[in-house]
Amino acid sequence: MSNQFLDLITKRRTIYAIGKNIEQSPERLTDLIQTAIKQSPSAFNSQSSRAVILFNTEHEKFWGIVADKLKSYAKDEASAAKTTAKMASFAAGVGTVLFFEDQTVVQALQEQFPSYADNFPV
């Protein structure tokens, strides 16, 4: 690995104040995400990782649904308010990426490699 890459990883920081001030278009972000998923190594080269990429109203709608559901689990008003504020901070961003594993690929691997079948579901 190049020192430049390792330096970038070392200097990386989480941004907590999420906002909509980005330089890339949604199309460019989608392309970057799709490329990263496609080029990421996977067990048995299964390429089973998938992503749903949400922008604009779909992104905001998603976080509204999550906030409503999580509020129903809150023990009191203070907890509900904290949860609502946290979900609002996520909704303040440009988009959301939801990662998942394609279970049809996993099932095919279980059939193709029966001796490893119990190890595939993650």
Q: Which positions does each model-derived feature cover?
A:
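Specificity-determining recognition surfaces
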Residues: 1-35, 45-47
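Basic side chains
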Residues: 12-13, 38, 50, 59
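Active-site loop/lid in soluble adenylation, ligation, and acyl-transfer enzymes
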Residues: 27, 42, 59
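Short secondary-structure capping/turn segments at boundaries of alpha-helices and beta-strands
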Residues: 34-41, 83-86
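Glycine/small-residue-rich phosphate/adenosyl-binding loop
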Residues: 48-122
